[in-house]
């Protein structure tokens, strides 16, 4: 059985911070969104978002989210597709920032992703892709 390895995804968090600072997700508290990259998973997904369950919130933890990118898939994408993937995951966060998730449909879809993507100031995102 392969063990999944998780590490911080500072590049993904940089994209999240930049999208929020550009005003596309004003309801997102970037201090409550963590970003991870997983290696060794067999999922077909490119990325996924995890909300803090209501049981944890009832126990006194504040709502939060983890955006997980699947390293083997995410890092093969172009920069444009990486950004679109992060936008898609952020769309799952409801305006209430309650720890819950929005389903695919009216608000979480390719049309909404593209609508946001075409309005981005890409010059501010370049720093997220610097290596070394």
At which residue positions do the language-model features occur?
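Active-site recognition of the HExxH zinc-binding catalytic motif
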Residues: 82-96
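Metalloprotease/metallohydrolase-associated module, dominated by Zn2+-dependent proteases
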Residues: 1-80, 96-132
């Amino acid at each position: 059985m392969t063990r999944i390895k998780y590490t911080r995804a500072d590049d993904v968090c940089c994209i999240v911070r930049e999208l929020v600072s550009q005003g596309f997700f004003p309801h997102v508290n970037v201090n409550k969104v963590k970003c991870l990259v997983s290696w060794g998973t067999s999922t077909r997904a490119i990325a996924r978002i995890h909300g803090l369950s209501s049981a944890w919130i009832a126990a006194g933890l504040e709502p939060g989210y983890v955006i997980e990118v699947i390293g083997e898939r995410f890092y093969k994408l172009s920069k444009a597709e990486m950004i679109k993937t992060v936008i898609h995951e952020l769309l799952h966060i409801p305006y209430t920032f309650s720890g819950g998730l929005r389903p695919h449909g009216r608000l979480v879809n390719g049309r909404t992703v593209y609508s946001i993507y075409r309005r981005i100031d890409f010059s501010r995102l370049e720093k997220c892709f610097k290596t070394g």
